[in-house]
């Protein structure tokens, strides 16, 4: 298992470190490090601190911040940037952009689980300029080219 360095920026978060809920979990819950409840009106976006910083350190890894499915489905709370990418060399605070795309106001409570952190492998590519590509079955077929329903 890979070890990731975590820096606790707020002492309240020392007992709230991201952890896998089950042996098969891919995501680690991130919590809102707030002093008081935060009201998100419909259409409003707020940047919410997690009270943590991470340093992945391994260029073969990155992290993505993803929405929690229950918050999105039940309350319309998703990420303002849709997906957050944390590069392996980033060492700053983890922040979550929460967007209320729902029709009702939503209150984010202190220490509420607001997003998930998933560690993913990264392959860095190098690019080579070519005049043409080798033939493939699909060719330049784009949207809708592989069939319908």
UniProtKB/Swiss-Prot annotation:
It catalyses: dUTP + H2O = dUMP + diphosphate + H(+). Its cofactor is Mg(2+). Keywords: Hydrolase, Magnesium, Metal-binding, Nucleotide metabolism. It holds the Pfam family dUTPase. Substrate binds at residues 68-70, 81, 85-87, 95. CDD domains: trimeric_dUTPase (cd07557). Gene3D superfamilies: 2.70.40.10. Pathway: Pyrimidine metabolism; dUMP biosynthesis; dUMP from dCTP (dUTP route): step 2/2. It is an enzyme of class 3 (hydrolase). InterPro entries: dUTPase, dUTPase-like, dUTPase-like_sf, dUTPase_trimeric. SUPFAM superfamilies: dUTPase-like (SSF51283). PANTHER family: DEOXYURIDINE 5'-TRIPHOSPHATE NUCLEOTIDOHYDROLASE. Belongs to the dUTPase family. This is Deoxyuridine 5'-triphosphate nucleotidohydrolase. It comes from Methylibium petroleiphilum (strain ATCC BAA-1232 / LMG 22953 / PM1). The lineage of its organism: Bacteria, Pseudomonadati, Pseudomonadota, Betaproteobacteria, Burkholderiales. The gene is dut.
């Amino acid at each position: 298992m890979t070890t990731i360095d975590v820096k606790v920026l707020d002492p309240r978060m020392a007992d709230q470190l991201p952890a896998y809920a089950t042996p098969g979990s891919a995501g680690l819950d991130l919590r809102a490090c707030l002093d008081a409840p935060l009201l998100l009106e419909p259409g409003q976006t707020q940047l919410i601190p997690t009270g943590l910083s991470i340093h992945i350190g391994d260029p073969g890894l990155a992290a993505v911040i993803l929405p929690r499915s229950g918050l999105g489905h039940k309350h319309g709370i998703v990420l303002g940037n849709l997906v957050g990418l944390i590069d392996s060399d980033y060492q700053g605070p983890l922040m979550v952009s929460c967007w209320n795309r729902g029709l009702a106001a939503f209150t984010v409570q202190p220490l509420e689980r607001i997003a998930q952190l998933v560690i993913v492998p990264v392959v860095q590519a190098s690019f080579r300029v070519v005049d043409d590509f080798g033939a493939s079955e699909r060719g330049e077929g784009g949207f809708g080219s592989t069939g319908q329903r």
